[in-house]
Amino acid sequence: MRPSIRSAQRFLHPAPGASKKVVREILGVVGLAGLVGLAGCYGHDHFFIAQQPIVNNALWVANGTNVVEFLPSQLTNGTSAPAPHLTLASTVFGAPQGVAFDGFGDLWVIDGGNIASGGMAMPAVYEFTVQQLSNLSKNNAPAPAVTIQSANFKFPQQAAFDGRGDLWVSDSGNNEVYVFLRSQMTASSTTSSTTVAPEIIMTSSTAFNGPIGIAFDGGGDLFVANNGGNTIYGFKASSLPNLNVMSEVTTPNGPPPTPVTPTVTLSNSGGSIQSPWGLAFDGFGNLWSSNAGAASTVVEFTRSQIAATGSPTPNITLASATVSSNATLVSPNGIGFDAFGDLAAVSSAAPFGVAGFGPEQLRTNPTSAPTPDVFLVGGATTLSAPTGVTFGPAFE
């Protein structure tokens, strides 16, 4: 089974009148900004060029104890309960929290582990190659191609690739962000040891408080959501540690923490930032955040709003609607954009749905809770306490 490769005549702007189902059958060939994902993998210093075009049209969800994939053809208008097309159920998994594709189309799973609940799975980051993903229909429990375990990990949850291909991992348990170089991630696949010390241990001069969501904008600025602090920090690219002058560390616990001062702090205003979980940038550079607290909303802050410290009122607020007795947003966690500007939001609490909002639903602030264009919900989906989400290659 190989990745689905279809030619694309349009990117982000389908022909007027084209049905969403038809649009979703077209493969989006992602440009430089999409080489490392629309949900926070833009350039830091310079671009990391992939070896192949990266596609961005299948839905991948970190789902309790596994990872599931839904094909674009399954993301049809209305409410449905499709069974996952593929399931990745590696025996090493404890509690997958986040999913991210690198510039080569390999999948990285951020796993918080289950030690705290009495299990044996250590917190780790795992890589599964294109070849392994292509073979999931025959072997849905492959051993990871790369395993990164670190003495620093306590409960890693989300990650973003910068433009160099380095991985930035947020750890809500330790209130730190860890940076692993491409070379470190590659080396861990060729050595017997899976323990890797981060190149950088990033802290904030104004302490992180349960950092989860993490995303780069188009200029390489880094944004981190403080789930425990009801704030979002923004760090200018120029203030981030310069990885060009770093050498790979050899001490088990890595280097001393590097404190960085936030350039921007966005604070809660009337529930606008309430237990923020996921972060994602749209194609216009606007920042979207999911509120996993009582608000259960997904909100947008414009480029101008995130340029300065304050408590901005969201430009757009997507609240939960009720469809067939099911709430569409319940403690939303992961959010992500596909190549056409559609937004997916995952509910981590029952009924464990995935709400998909089309670009036309994201242009203006709705006067009432919008009904998602696409709503996946029901037992057949196998969704159970899902968390992270991303769009990536479709394997058919």
Per-region residue spans from a language model:
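An edge-strand/N-cap motif at the start of beta-rich repeat modules
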Residues: 44-91, 96-99, 107, 126, ...
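Bacterial Sec-dependent N-terminal signal peptides
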Residues: 2-5, 11, 23-24, 32-61, ...
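Short loop/turn segments immediately following the C-termini of beta-strands
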Residues: 64, 112-114, 120, 172-173, ...
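Short loop/turn segments immediately following beta-strands, especially the blade-tip
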Residues: 70-78, 128-138, 181-191, 235-253, ...
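A short loop-to-beta-strand structural motif that recurs across blades of beta-propeller domains
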Residues: 66-69, 123-127, 175-181, 230-234, ...
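A short beta-strand motif characteristic of beta-propeller blades
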Residues: 82-90, 142-150, 196-204, 259-269, ...
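Beta-rich, blade/repeat-based domains predominating
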Residues: 44-55, 91-106, 120, 150-164, ...
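Conserved beta-propeller blade signature
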Residues: 58-61, 106-109, 166-169, 221-224, ...
